[in-house]
From Swiss-Prot:
Record-linked CDD domains: YjgF_YER057c_UK114_family (cd00448)
UniProt-listed PROSITE patterns: UPF0076
The protein's name: RutC family protein y4sK
Family affiliation: Belongs to the RutC family.
Pfam families tied to this protein: Ribonuc_L-PSP (PF01042)
Species this chain originates from: Sinorhizobium fredii (strain NBRC 101917 / NGR234)
Gene3D superfamilies assigned: RutC-like
Keywords in alphabetical order: Plasmid
Example GO molecular function: deaminase activity
Any one cellular-component term (Gene Ontology): cytosol
Length: 126
C-alpha cells in the first residue's frame, strides 16, 4: 500500500509531489530544499546553512513517519557548486553516523527557487 506522509514541520512541496511516500518498510522522501517551514523562505544563502536546513527538513519528515535519520539507507545530494562538497560533508556527519547511508552527490546547473543544495532520502521504517 502507498501512503503519503506529510508534516507542517517541513516545507510543503513546491510542485505536484508528496513530501514523502511510505511503501512497505521504506520511506521515500522527496528532495528537500533549504526552506524554513516557519517562514517559507530560505534560511540562508550559504550552502553549509542550506544543507543543514535540508537535513532538518528530512529529519522532520522521518519523524512524522515514525522513524529517524539513523535508519537512512540512501541519500542523493544535489549541489550547484561541487566546490561546496567538503563543507557539506561536515554538515552531513552531524546528522548521520557510521555506517553512513549509501549516497550519490551531483553538481547540477540549477535547483528550484535558486537553492544551492537539495537532499532526498530513502529511509527504513524497521
Amino acid at each position: 500500500m502507498i501512503e503519503p506522509i506529510s508534516t507542517n514541520d517541513a516545507p510543503g512541496a513546491v510542485g505536484p509531489y508528496s513530501q514523502a511516500i511510505k511503501v512497505g518498510d521504506l520511506l521515500f522522501v522527496s528532495g528537500q530544499l533549504p526552506i524554513d517551514p516557519a517562514t517559507g523562505e530560505f534560511n540562508s544563502a550559504n550552502a553549509v546553512e542550506q544543507a543543514e536546513q535540508c537535513l532538518k527538513n528530512l529529519q522532520a519528515i522521518a519523524r512524522a513517519a515514525g522513524t529517524d535519520l539513523s535508519k537512512t539507507v540512501k541519500t542523493t545530494v544535489l549541489l550547484t557548486d561541487l566546490g561546496d562538497f567538503a563543507d557539506i560533508n561536515r554538515v552531513y556527519t552531524g546528522f548521520f553516523s557510521t555506517p553512513y547511508p549509501a549516497r550519490a552527490c551531483y553538481e547540477v546547473k540549477a535547483l528550484p527557487k535558486g537553492a544551492k543544495v537539495e537532499i532526498e532520502a530513502v529511509i527504513s521504517l524497521t
